[in-house]
């Protein structure tokens, strides 16, 4: 049986294992996440649960309808965000993901939505590198399961398991530094280089 699932912000277990999910609204009130038909067919329930779990860390989006679509696994793109500069605020936001993508990629794409809809309010600048920095600060350390793609260096990626806690702390510091200096990304990357020494 397929049924609609409703959520409350404080729900600890958002989805029961025995519930088959579809593209119905997975909601906070009347808003929340909807899976497209292709995503619903190609994503496992476990992956859908992870997307919903990550969505909890983006409360600014809970009053929006967010569509989650599917990207073919053959392509190079792990995730994408569909943003039209002239899109109406009443239109649903949309991200697309490859099946079973990492938590960090999911958070990165949700952060792009914040860049689009809450840029002024949250002071999140546009761009992929800024998106990586802000995404690092959104998730608890234990949910960060992959390194950022647009910032850092080879040694950071190679030693990710041992440096991710420090890199996340540097991301918080970089956001603070940005309040007074424009070169916060350069500062962040210089500090990451020092971790390899």
Q: Where are these predicted regions, by residue range?
A:
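A short, highly charged nucleic-acid-interacting micro-segment common to nuclease
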Residues: 36-47, 125-128
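Catalytic Zn2+-binding segment of zinc metalloproteases
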Residues: 110-130, 134-143
């Amino acid at each position: 049986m397929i049924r609609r699932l409703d959520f409350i912000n404080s729900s600890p277990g958002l989805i029961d294992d025995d519930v088959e999910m579809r593209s119905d609204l997975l909601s906070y009130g009347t808003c929340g996440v909807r899976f497209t038909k292709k995503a619903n067919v190609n994503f496992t329930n476990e992956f859908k649960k992870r997307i919903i779990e990550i969505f909890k860390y983006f409360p600014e989006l809970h009053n929006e309808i967010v569509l989650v679509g599917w990207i073919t696994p053959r392509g190079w793109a792990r995730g994408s965000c569909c943003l039209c500069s002239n899109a109406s605020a009443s239109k649903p936001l949309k991200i697309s993901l490859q099946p079973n993508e990492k938590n960090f990629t999911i958070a990165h794409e949700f952060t792009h939505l914040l860049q689009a809809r809450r840029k002024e309010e949250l002071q999140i600048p546009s761009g992929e590198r800024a998106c990586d920095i802000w995404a690092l600060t959104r998730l608890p350390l234990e949910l960060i399961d992959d390194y950022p793609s647009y910032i850092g260096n080879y040694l950071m990626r190679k030693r990710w398991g041992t440096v991710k806690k420090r890199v996340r702390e540097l991301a918080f510091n970089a956001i603070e530094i940005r309040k007074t200096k424009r070169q916060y990304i350069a500062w962040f990357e210089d500090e990451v280089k020092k971790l390899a020494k």
